[in-house]
Curated annotation (Swiss-Prot):
The gene is PCMP-E101. The keyword Repeat applies. InterPro entries: E_motif, Pentatricopeptide_rpt, PPR_At4g14850-like_plant, TPR-like_helical_dom_sf. It comes from Arabidopsis thaliana. GO terms for biological process: RNA modification. Belongs to the PPR family. PCMP-E subfamily. The keyword ATP-binding does not apply. SUPFAM superfamilies: TPR-like (SSF48452). PPR repeats lie at residues 104-138, 139-173, 174-204, 205-239, 240-266, 267-301, 303-337, 338-368, 369-403, 404-434, 440-474. PROSITE patterns: PPR. Residues 475-545 are annotated as: Type E motif. This is Pentatricopeptide repeat-containing protein At4g18840. Gene3D superfamilies: Tetratricopeptide repeat domain. Keywords: Repeat. GO terms for molecular function: RNA binding.
Length: 545
C-alpha cells in the first residue's frame, strides 16, 4: 500500500500538466513510511524525466520524503539529471552532487562525463578536482571522462598533468584511458606525443588509431591522415567515414569517392558523408545520384541528415519533382517533420516557386524551431509577400520564440519589399533594445537600401556613420545610386567624397558621380572626374552619353 501511494505521488510530480505541487501536500507525504522498496517508483519516473523542471520536482519529492539521504537514490538522481544534454540540467546535477553527504565514484563520474559531453567541458576539471579532495579517489572511468573533456577544449597542459597523475595513481593501464590520451594530444596539435602514446600501447584497437586519425583530419592534415589510414592495423567503418569526411572538408571529392567505393561495409554515416562531400562543392546532381543509389543498393535507410541534404540539393537545382518525391517518402515512412527537416522542406518548396506549399508545410509542422520560422519569413519576403512575412513574425513572437539576427534580416527585407519604412524603423530599434540582437552590416544594408529607395538620404547617411569604415563602402555606393534616382547632386558629392576617402583607388565613386554630372549636363565635372581617375591610376571604362 505504501508503494502504491508513493507511486501515485510520483505520478503527480512528474506530470505537472495534470497536477501541481499543492496537490502533493494533500497526500500527507509526511505520514508515509519509507520502506526499502520506496525508491523504485520515483526513480523510474526520474529516469523518464525530460526537462529540468521534472527533475527538480523529483528532487523536491526526495527531499520531502527523506529519500535524498539515501546515497543510492541520490546518486541515481544525479546520474539521471546528468544524462540530459541541456547545460542548465548538467549544472543542476552538479549542484545536487555538492549536496550529497557521501557521494560515491559513480556519482562523480556521471557529472564529469556530462560536462565532458557538454558545451562547457572545462567544468569537468572542477568536478575532478573536487573528487581528488574527497574520500573517493578517481578510478579509470574518472580519468577517461576528464581526459575526454581535455580533448574537447584542446587542453594540452591539463591533459598532460592528468596523464601524470594517472601514472602515479598505480591504476592498471587501460586501453580506454590511452585512447583518450591519444585524442587529447592529437587535438591539441601535439602529434608526435600522440603517436608515441599510440606506439607504446600494448594493445591497440581501431578506436586507438581513429583517435589520432580524427585529430589529423580535424586540423586539415589530409595527407598525414591518409598515411596513417594506410598504416592502420585495424579499421572499422568509422575509420573509413573519417577519411571520407576529411576529404570532403578539403574539397577533394574524387578522393572521397574512391574511399567510399572501397569500403567493405557502409553505414548511414558513410552515405551521409558522401552526400556532404558533393554538396560541399555544389555538385547537387551527384547528391541526388548518391541518394538514389542508397535507396536501391543499401540496407541502410536515410535519416534526417540525409533527407535535409537531399532537399537542399533539390532546392539548389530547382528540382520540384524530386523534392516532392522526397516529401512523399517522408510521409510514407512516418518520419516526423520537425526542426531542420521542416526547414529544408519549406525552403525547397519556396525555391522551387511553390510558396503556397511551403506555407502549408510550415502550418502543418507541430514542432517548429527558430530556423523554421526564419525560413518561412525569409521565403515570403523573397516572394514579395512582405505583409505575410510580418504577420508570421508576429505569430513567432506571440508563441514565445526569440528572434535572432537571421529573423531580423528577413523582416527588414520584407519591409523593404513593401515599402513599410515606419515598421522597419521600429523593428530595427527593437533588435537591440528588446531582443538584444546587435545589428550587423546586413541589417544596416536593409535599412539603408529602404531609406534610399524612399528618398531619406540624410537619415541613411546617419546610419552609415554608425558602421565601421571598412564596411561602409558598399552601403555608400548604394546611397549614391539613390541620389541619382532622386537627383540629389549635393548629397551625392558628399557621399562620393567620403567613398573616395575610404578608398582612393575604388572607381565606383568616380563612375557614379560622372554619370550624375552627365545626366545634369555638367560636362566640365565629367572631364574633371576622368582626370582625377587618371591621376589616381584608376582603370575604369566609362560610358558617357
Amino acid at each position: 500500500m505504501v508503494e502504491k501511494d508513493i507511486y501515485m505521488c510520483a505520478e503527480i510530480i512528474i506530470r505537472p500538466q495534470a497536477y501541481n505541487l499543492r496537490l502533493l501536500q494533500k497526500e500527507n507525504l509526511k505520514k508515509m513510511s519509507v520502506c526499502s522498496s520506496t525508491p523504485v517508483p520515483i526513480l523510474s519516473f526520474t529516469e523518464r524525466a525530460k526537462s529540468l523542471t521534472e527533475i527538480q520536482q523529483a528532487h523536491a519529492f526526495m527531499l520531502k520524503t527523506g529519500l535524498f539521504h539515501d546515497t543510492f537514490s541520490a546518486s541515481k538522481l544525479v546520474a539521471f539529471a546528468a544524462t540530459n544534454p541541456e547545460p542548465k540540467t548538467v549544472s543542476y546535477a552538479h549542484s545536487i552532487l555538492n549536496r550529497i553527504g557521501s557521494p560515491n565514484g559513480f556519482t562523480h563520474n556521471s557529472v564529469i562525463r556530462a560536462y565532458a559531453n557538454s558545451s562547457t567541458p572545462e567544468v569537468a576539471l572542477t568536478v575532478f578536482r573536487e573528487m581528488l579532495l574527497g574520500p573517493v579517489f578517481p578510478d579509470k572511468y574518472s580519468f577517461t571522462f576528464v581526459l575526454k573533456a581535455c580533448a574537447a577544449f584542446c587542453g594540452f597542459e591539463e591533459g598532460r598533468q592528468i596523464h601524470g597523475l594517472f601514472i602515479k595513481s598505480g591504476l592498471v593501464t587501460d586501453v580506454f584511458v590511452e585512447n583518450t590520451l591519444v585524442n587529447v594530444y592529437g587535438r591539441s596539435g601535439y602529434f608526435e606525443i600522440a603517436r608515441k602514446v599510440l606506439d607504446r600501447m600494448p594493445v591497440r584497437d581501431a578506436v586507438s588509431w581513429n583517435s589520432l586519425l580524427s585529430a589529423y583530419l580535424e586540423k586539415g592534415l589530409v595527407d598525414e591522415a591518409r598515411a596513417l589510414f594506410d598504416e592502420m592495423e585495424e579499421r572499422n567503418v568509422e575509420s573509413w567515414n573519417f577519411m571520407i569526411s576529411g576529404y570532403a572538408a578539403a574539397g577533394l571529392v574524387k578522393e572521397a569517392k574512391e574511399v567510399f567505393d572501397s569500403m567493405p561495409v557502409r553505414d548511414v554515416v558513410s552515405w551521409n558523408a558522401m552526400v556532404t562531400a558533393y554538396a560541399h562543392v555544389g555538385c547537387y546532381n551527384e547528391v541526388l545520384e548518391v541518394f538514389n543509389k542508397m535507396l536501391d543498393d543499401s540496407t541502410e535507410k536515410p535519416d534526417g541528415f540525409t533527407l535535409v541534404s537531399v532537399l537542399s540539393a533539390c532546392a539548389s537545382l530547382g528540382s520540384l519533382s524530386q523534392g516532392e518525391w522526397v516529401h512523399v517518402y517522408i510521409d510514407k515512412h512516418g518520419i516526423e517533420i520537425e526542426g531542420f527537416l521542416a526547414t529544408a522542406l519549406v525552403d525547397m518548396y519556396s525555391k522551387c516557386g511553390k510558396i503556397d506549399k511551403a506555407l502549408e508545410v510550415f502550418r502543418a509542422t507541430s514542432k517548429r524551431d527558430v530556423s523554421t520560422w526564419n525560413s518561412i519569413i525569409s521565403d515570403l519576403s523573397v516572394h514579395g509577400l512582405g505583409k505575410d512575412a510580418l504577420e508570421i513574425f508576429s505569430e513567432m513572437v506571440y508563441e514565445g520564440f526569440k528572434p535572432n539576427g537571421i529573423t531580423f534580416i528577413g523582416v527588414l527585407s520584407a519591409c523593404n519589399h513593401v515599402g513599410m519604412l515606419d515598421q522597419a524603423r521600429k523593428l530595427f530599434e527593437m533588435m537591440s533594445s528588446v531582443y538584444r540582437v546587435e545589428p550587423t552590416i546586413e541589417h544596416y544594408g536593409c535599412m539603408v537600401d529602404l531609406l534610399g529607395r524612399m528618398g531619406k538620404i540624410e537619415e541613411a547617411e546617419e546610419l552609415v556613420n554608425e558602421i565601421p569604415a571598412d564596411e561602409a563602402s558598399i552601403l555608400l555606393e548604394s546611397l549614391l545610386g539613390a541620389c541619382k534616382r532622386f537627383g540629389q547632386l549635393e548629397q551625392a558629392e558628399r557621399i562620393a567624397n567620403r567613398l573616395l576617402e575610404l578608398n582612393l583607388r575604388d572607381s565606383s565613386g568616380y563612375a557614379q558621380m560622372s554619370n550624375l554630372y552627365a545626366s545634369d549636363g555638367r560636362w566640365e565635372k565629367v572631364i574633371d572626374g576622368r582626370r582625377n581617375m587618371r591621376a589616381e591610376r584608376v582603370n575604369r571604362s566609362l560610358d558617357v552619353a
